[in-house]
Amino acid sequence: MIEKLTFGLFKKEDARSFMRLMAYVRPYKIRIVAALIAIFGVAATESYLAAFIAPLINHGFSAPAAPPELSAAAGIISTLQNWREQFTYMVWGTENKIWTVPLFLIILVVIRGICRFTSTYLMTWVSVMTISKIRKDMFAKMLTLSSRYHQETPSGTVLMNMLNLTEQSVSNASDIFTVLTRDTMIVTGLTIVLLYLNWQLSLIVVLMFPLLSLLSRYYRDRLKHVISDSQKSIGTMNNVIAETHQGHRVVKLFNGQAQAANRFDAVNRTIVRLSKKITQATAAHSPFSELIASIALAVVIFIALWQSQNGYTTIGEFMAFIVAMLQMYAPIKSLANISIPMQTMFLAADGVCAFLDTPPEQDKGTLAPQRVEGRISFRNVDVEYRSDGIKALDNFNLDIRQGERVALVGRSGSGKSTVVNLLPRFVEPSAGNICIDGIDIADIKLDCLRAQFALVSQDVFLFDDTLFENVRYSRPDAGEAEVLFALQTANLQSLIDSSPLGLHQPIGSNGSNLSGGQRQRVAIARAILKDAPILLLDEATSALDNESERLVQQALERLMENRTGIIVAHRLTTIEGADRIIVMDDGKIIEQGTHEQLMSQNGYYTMLRNISNKDAAVRTA
């Protein structure tokens, strides 16, 4: 079907993704049919306005005529001919034509205007609703994607898929559908008028269609890769803007404005270069199509003048033919230029469908425990992030008792955070298995598994909302009293009292209105409100001053009461009271025991502790 609609410019393979997106349009088929009827009205009135010229010149300036002699023959054709004769006489033959002709013209223009407004409004409405539904499905898909996808895919690419490509695919589709249907109908109607007026001259007009089709095909093939590269460059630009916005402090602190500007300029120049190619092709396409149409028009005028001199045509028919041909020029030009936006539309649809087809996070679990006790075991666990064979965890084995506080220490890259990320399945093991209360976590439904954990990390993320909503994010059904208790437990009563809005004070983008310690304690309050049986702390007190660390540590102590806790620590002074300390290096456990036991061994932990004490002395000094 797409080959017929585009006169062979595009094949079924080009439009596969686009046709898939058209499933979103089906609920609005009644409105589309109504738009088609309105488009038909535009085409019909446009065509008749061209045919209007011949009787205007041939009959409009002549004396009133006698009533026509109607055919007495039976049949549909004779009846239609009689109606035509009667209508022509009513408009052109009576003395009243001095007001019926202008009135008839006004009625035609009003009908065309109403039909044009109706078709434009309905197609725009369908386009907006379709874009909304596709974006809703894309956002729902994004929520199901794995942590690995979010880590590996730049945010600019995701934004481009959800905003730019969706807009390009559906909005272009609406415009192209209108052009294909309306202008094709107009060209068809005007062609019928031309054939009616002078079939010999019409053949010349018809001959230019294949030439215009070949011209469009040439530019389509030339621009396919340029348009694709342009769309990718827009994604890169989105990513540069997002990174600069999110990392504005780093940019300012390291005087990186010039570097940021250079990155942006490089991408911007690429987009400009590609846009110039697209613009050049578009600009060159129009003059060539105009040249073909002008040659056809010149030939028509030459032959029509010859026919007029030899009495084969009337002045009215000649003028009507020229007007119809000139009216045909604009829709033919639109149809000839449609290959570039169609190419953009198909490539954008490919990008949207590729995003929708991204495999979701695997969830093959069938068990749904309500609340676990908190016993955790790692059995022969390997984790490989890269394909070079280097393991983040290597044959890792660990048992954690219910209610036990276990601290993981070691140098950077030793595998501490990987252990934490394995439990909620942000990372999947390459080998081995992990059990909670004797149940393999792969057999537990993801939502039920993650409901068992509360996480407080060094990279706190807060939403651009109120303090109340940020804390309540972990339990949307919680009331103000519960949220207030969680905040008080997290040592944030002073923050509540500092604003007349109290719980409902806005905290800014990612908590920009708060200090580092306050942001950390808001995350702790969120974890307190969730009341999960297992607590994961990933360097939750790093990069805090002594007073903030003291307040955060007090809040953490309250949070860890009667819970199994796994603590990743950088400052070793914060985990001296842990039930057990696991010392890691190169993805393996090399020492474990209490603080006193490990210090007495004078081993790797003692070395780390001495380094930590020196760092603390430097910070204090």
Swiss-Prot record:
Its job: Involved in lipopolysaccharide (LPS) biosynthesis. Translocates lipid A-core from the inner to the outer leaflet of the inner membrane. Transmembrane domains (TMD) form a pore in the inner membrane and the ATP-binding domain (NBD) is responsible for energy generation.
Lineage of the species this protein comes from: Bacteria, Pseudomonadati, Pseudomonadota, Betaproteobacteria, Neisseriales
ABC transporter domain mapped to chain residues: 378-611
Binding site for ATP: 410-417
PROSITE patterns xref list: ABC_TM1F (PS50929), ABC_TRANSPORTER_1 (PS00211), ABC_TRANSPORTER_2 (PS50893), MSBA (PS51239)
Quaternary structure and partners: Homodimer.
GO molecular function: ABC-type transporter activity; ATP binding; ATP hydrolysis activity; ATPase-coupled lipid transmembrane transporter activity; ATPase-coupled transmembrane transporter activity
Keyword Translocase: yes
Protein known as: ATP-dependent lipid A-core flippase
Membrane-crossing segments per the record: 32-52, 91-111, 192-212, 286-306, 312-332
Family label: Belongs to the ABC transporter superfamily. Lipid exporter (TC 3.A.1.106) family.
Domain notes: In MsbA the ATP-binding domain (NBD) and the transmembrane domain (TMD) are fused.
Keyword Transport applies: yes
InterPro entries attached to this UniProt entry: AAA+_ATPase, ABC1_TM_dom, ABC1_TM_sf, ABC_transporter-like_ATP-bd, ABC_transporter-like_CS, ABC_transpr_lipidA, P-loop_NTPase, Type_1_exporter
Principal location: membrane
EC number of this enzyme: 7.5.2.6
Membrane topology: Multi-pass membrane protein
Annotated compartments: Cell inner membrane
The entry's keywords: ATP-binding, Cell inner membrane, Cell membrane, Lipid transport, Membrane, Nucleotide-binding, Translocase, Transmembrane, Transmembrane helix, Transport
Any one cellular-component term (Gene Ontology): plasma membrane
